[in-house]
Structures are given as C-alpha cells and as structure tokens.
Curated annotation (Swiss-Prot):
Protein family according to the UniProt entry: Belongs to the major facilitator superfamily. FHS transporter (TC 2.A.1.7) family.
Residues annotated as transmembrane: 21-41, 62-82, 90-110, 113-133, 158-178, 192-212, 239-259, 310-330, 331-351, 363-383, 388-408
GO MF annotation: an example: galactose transmembrane transporter activity
UniProt name for this protein: Glucose/galactose transporter
GO cellular component, one term: plasma membrane
Location relative to the cell: Cell inner membrane
Amino acid sequence: MATSIPTNNPLHTETSSQKNYGFALTSLTLLFFMWGFITCLNDILIPHLKNVFQLNYTQSMLIQFCFFGAYFIVSLPAGQLVKRISYKRGIVVGLIVAAIGCALFIPAASYRVYALFLGALFVLASGVTILQVAANPYVTILGKPETAASRLTLTQAFNSLGTTVAPVFGAVLILSAATDATVNAEADAVRFPYLLLALAFTVLAIIFAILKPPDVQEDEPALSDKKEGSAWQYRHLVLGAIGIFVYVGAEVSVGSFLVNFLSDPTVAGLSETDAAHHVAYFWGGAMVGRFIGSAAMRYIDDGKALAFNAFVAIILLFITVATTGHIAMWSVLAIGLFNSIMFPTIFSLALHGLGSHTSQGSGILCLAIVGGAIVPLIQGALADAIGIHLAFLMPIICYAYIAFYGLIGSKS
C-alpha cells in the first residue's frame, strides 16, 4: 500500500522503532469514541430542545450550525496552539474545554434559555475541535509510517462505535427523562447526562496529563525541504481539505435525510420509528468497515482503496435515485459501509510529508469539517425543489471528487 506518511517524515517519536505505543493508542482511541459520541448525541438534543422551546426547524438546526461552526472558527487557531504547546498538551486543553462545555449545560438548563444551550454547545464543540487537531496527526506518528492510515482507520472505528452508542444513551437519559409533561422537567433532562460527560472528559484530561504519552519531535526537513512558508503551499493538503469538506458534507447529508427518505411511501414507507431503527445499519456499517479497513489497508494502496469506496458509493447512490422500495432503502444504507475508511484515509494522505507544518495542516483539515453544515443545506434546497429522492444526486458530486483525490489529487 502507499505510505501515507513517508519513512523520512520529520514527525517522529523518540526511539519510535523500538517503543510499543499500544497504551498511548488505546488512550487516544477513547478520545475518538468520545467525540463520536458527543457529535451523534446532537441528533437526540435537536428534537429534545425543539420540543422544550417550541422551535421551528430552522431554529432547531442552529444546534448543528453552532457545532460545525466551532470547527470553522477554532480549527486554525487550534493548529497554532498545538504546534506551540505539543500534541499531548493540546489534547489535555481540548479535554478541559470540552468538559467546561458539558458543564455549561447545567446552568443552561437552570435558566432555560436556548441561547445558553447554543453557547454551551459551541464551547463543547471547540474542545472537540482541539482534540481532533491534536489527536488525528498524533495517531499517524505513533508507530510505523507505512501503517499510519491503518491506525487512523482503527481509531475512527471506535469513533463510529461512539456514534452508534450515543442515540441509545440519549434516548434513555434524555428523552425518557423528559416524559414529564412540564417544560421545567424537560429542560432539566439534559443535566445528568452532560454532567456525566463533563466528569468523563475531566478524568481523561487528568489521565493524559499524568501519563505523559510520548511527545512528537518536529525538527527535520519536511517534504521537498520546504522549511519556510506554511502548510498551504502543499497542493495535496489543499485538495485533501476539499476532500474532507465534501466527505463530511456527504456523510452528514445522507445521514440527515435517512429517516425522511425511508419514511417516504415511494421508498420503504416505514414509520419514523422504524426508519430511525434502520439508520443504525448506516452507522453500524461505517463502524464495521473501519474495523475491517484497519486490517486490510495494511496491504492495500491508500489512494486506490479510497477511490474504490467512492466509486461504490456513487453506484449505490445512482441505484438509490433510480429505484424504490427495499432496493433503494438498502442501497442508501449500504453507503455507510463504504464511507468507513474515507475520513481517516483522506486525512492521512493529506498530511503526507508536511513535517513541521503538520499541526497547521491538521487544523486546515479540521476547518474543512464545516462541510457538514453547508452541503446538507444544499441538499435540503434540492429536496424542496425537486423532491427528496432526486436530492440524493447531490452527494454523488462529493464522492466523485473523493475518487479524484484518491487517484490523482493525493499525489504529492
């Protein structure tokens, strides 16, 4: 397989060829689980707060805009912060900020002001952004460069596990706790789960501060001896940022429309409850695919694997648009399986050979996650104009670009 980060990459840990980084990777895997969990918990928070504050759909979607807006605003400063204080300290800072964000849900519930919930969510998402900027590249250098994409894919598999578990957690601790008819009780339902999350983030921050996982050295030349300038001078990074933008946009778009799509009488005609249960196959497929990919991609070219999965996703979307019934239903749900390796592979390919610019490059890539807020809006406009069925043509454009990046754009 193609090496995502070359053997002469200036990013390295002390005696990296001799050390076993299993415990450090295990700790990092917990972080991936946590931010996947937090992100998917928004799917429960949106309908819950919509009912509490009697919001319309546009107002309730401010939850997602605040979350992804944090990526857009915080990513680049986070990259500079991580470069200045190290990956490990960046992780600790991210955990503390995320813990503060979770804790802010308690006064937000007490005062029952929607804007306070949005502010708390923004702080929480800012912490998650710092974690992503620090942890993603950290995983790529904890071990052999040749298996960087494989390691990142494995940790992303646990991110998918978090997205699978979060709705169950939210349904039990938020929605079931809000069965009381009063608004006060419904608002208070978020206190306990977010208090638990604040404590979890705090414990993880203490663990990372005490255990002191190996620090990364960034003291050798980057690719092509580009010691000056910035990460923006690397073509494959810029194209990779576009890849992250369209990938996250496509994933969020498909996932966001699944319940309505599967409830459509011309597709599966499921009730919304049954449709929601079927959505688990979409996220579960991503989780399974990442576990498989973490092993398989040790032996497969990263770019070719990315392009193959993108082409299959395109085929599945064409089938989704062209058919109805169970064929359309299972075609769109199967996309989750082929989404599995895309984010970690694009991320790893884009950071190839950035050397001392890697932390800044990671910030740029995390900045591109704002695609999760923009692409769904475009698909939503299409759904209003031409119907939800034909609106699934939009993600095809995204996956076509991802295929291009895997075959051509990722070449440095």
